[in-house]
Amino acid sequence: MLYIVATPIGNLKDITLRAIEVLKSVDLIACEDTRHTKILLDHYSIKTSTTSFFQHNRFTKGEYLLKLLQQNKNIALVSDAGTPGILDPGYNLINLAITNNIPMTFIPGPTAFINALVLSGKPTHRFIFEGFLPAKAQAQIGRAHV
């Protein structure tokens, strides 16, 4: 089973009890940066082994993680902050799981763009999310509308 686990985006206390429970019970945690995730795991005394899964190893590590999932191992996928699969390489493992009929479950939690949307004070019944703005200021012109 692949557990897609949202993690705090700033305050370590912004994590669900279910997320802590899952992170303690799985066989392995796949994370963008093991050093970053270790801070969260240490805070909650979670001793589960971790492995890195990031942009530059997503193909080789993805195949390794897929083999473990096919051996009925339970793996939690986390991002450095927020929800895996949103603007991070987690979508690659999620896609592999879907393609290979691996069961998945989602452990919801913080998502930065939802927080920004709510804090905008604007109506939230319709919105478009296009990811990160371009790095150059000139390219940002006309892209962000609130």
Label the model's feature ranges.
Residues 1-2, 72-76:
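Loop/turn-to-beta-strand initiation segments
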Residues 1-55:
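Glycine-rich, flexible N-terminal cofactor/catalytic loop recognition
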Residues 5, 115-143:
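Beta-strand/loop-alpha-helix module characteristic of Rossmann-like adenine-cofactor folds
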Residues 9-10, 80-84:
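Short glycine-rich anion-binding loops that position phosphate/pyrophosphate groups of nucleotides
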Residues 51-60, 132-137:
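Conserved helicase motor
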Residues 55-70, 89:
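Short phosphate-binding loop-to-helix
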Residues 85-100:
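Short Gly/Thr/Asp-enriched flexible loops that form oxyanion-binding sites at enzyme active sites
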Residues 96-116, 127-133:
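Short, acidic/small-residue loops that bind anionic groups at enzyme active sites
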